[in-house]
Every structure is written in C-alpha cells, then in structure tokens.
Amino acid sequence: MEISTESSARLDREYAQPFSVQLKEAVHRVFLSYWRNPTYISSKLFLNLVGGLFIGSSFWGQGDKTSNASLQNKLFATFMSLVLSTSLSQQLQPEFINQRNLFEVRERPSKLYSWVVFLLSQAIVEIPWNLFGGTLFWIPWYYMAQFGRESSRAGFSWGMYMIFQIYFASFAQAVATVAPNAMIASVLFSTLFSFVMVFCGVIQPPRQLPYFWREWMFYLSPFTWLIESMMGNFIHDKVVRCLPDELNDVPTPPGTSCEQHMDLSLIHISERAGKA
C-alpha cells in the first residue's frame, strides 16, 4: 500500500494538529477554566478596585497641586500603584502552577499541544482580565488623585498602566515556570521584584544609591522608566509654586548684600561637592 507524501508528513509530525489549531483550542480551554473559577477572577477584580479606591483617597487631590510636597505625593502615588502588582502576581502564580501541573501530567504525555502553546495560552488569557482589572484600579486612582483632566494626559497614563499590567503578569508567569510549587514561586518573585522596586530611585534617590547598583540596576529596572514617563506626563506644562512653609529664610551677614552672600555660599557648596 502506497502512502501519499501529505499523509506521510502528517504521520511524521509530533502533534496531531498544527500550531495554530493547538493555540486556538488551548486559549479557548484556558478561558473556560478561568470562567469556571469565579473566586480567582473576583479576587483579582476586587483587589484592583479596592486598591484604586484606597490609594486614590490617600492622595486625594494631590495631582492638581503644584507645591514641592505635592510633587513628592505624586511620585509616591505613582509608586504605590505599581507596588499593588506584587499581591496580584501572588494571586496569579498558584493558578498558573495548577494549569502547568495538569499539562505535565496529561497534555504533554498525550501530545495534545506543545509547551510553547501552553505558555502562550496562559499569557494571552491573562491579558484581558488584567486590562479590565487594571482599568478598575486606574479610574478611582487617577481621578481621586486628580492628576489631570486633559484627555491626552489621562490617555497616556492609562496606556502606560495597561502596559505595566502585561509586564508584571508575564514576569510572574515566567518566575512560576521555573518554580516547583506556588510557595517557592512567591519567594522567587518577591526577591526579584524587590530589586526592581528598591533601585528605581523612589525609595532612595539615585545619587544616594550605592555606586555598584546605581551604575546598572537603576537603569535596568523597568520601574525607573515607567515612573519617569508617568511623572513626566503628570507634571508636563505645570509650574511648581512652593508654599510659604516650604521656603527657607537665609539671613545675610552684616555688610553684605543677598547677592554677595549667595555667591559665596554657591562657591562653598561647589568646593565641597568637588572634594566629595
């Protein structure tokens, strides 16, 4: 009996279906799995909504102010919006590991679909839920803090936050991929993510970071560029006006003008900086 070339090629394939069919069916299956797990979905959405209300109310109206203190409040409001991702990631990882265990026990031995298809399906299904949950967080956070009424400013902020949703979810899944269980995945993620948060220049200014970390980890941290872009968007075209209690009175010595005294002070500061 002769076998055609096409039939022979099909017999030589590792999987019964091509990559596109595998991915389509795997994505559909994971969507159904998520839909049948309302505890995971509701906890994700609830945490985003409550987090947005809590952080937004904590920094109420700070985005509309232009004092020196309000700039710091804007910075920490932005930073706190990113810190929430640690809790969301630790919700995500056990679900991912349960799906992975099922794949390794049943799907991989039976050659239903490949490891790449499994990873892509998990990442794809997380995206719409994270975008929806991130929007639930962003609306109260942005408008309660009053970062700006302009549509361009709001749209840019929302877009950057949606990119961040995809980033932290994929990062958490990548860590869970190499972890044997959810507990170790949580420890690994917290350890690695702490580097991203600590060396982004918010908790400690870049100039005060140790030289070793400042020269590479500060620039490597995605938080550095994300916070910089969001803060640049919030303070663009806004004039900073210090409040009276934020100004320091500088008494001048007798016989010198304010200009002369400040010139001498600047020279002294420059010399000290040069020695340092």
Report residues per predicted region.
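Short, membrane-interfacial amphipathic segments enriched in basic
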Residues: 5-25, 215-222
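Membrane-spanning alpha-helical segments of multipass transporters and channels
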Residues: 35-266, 270-272
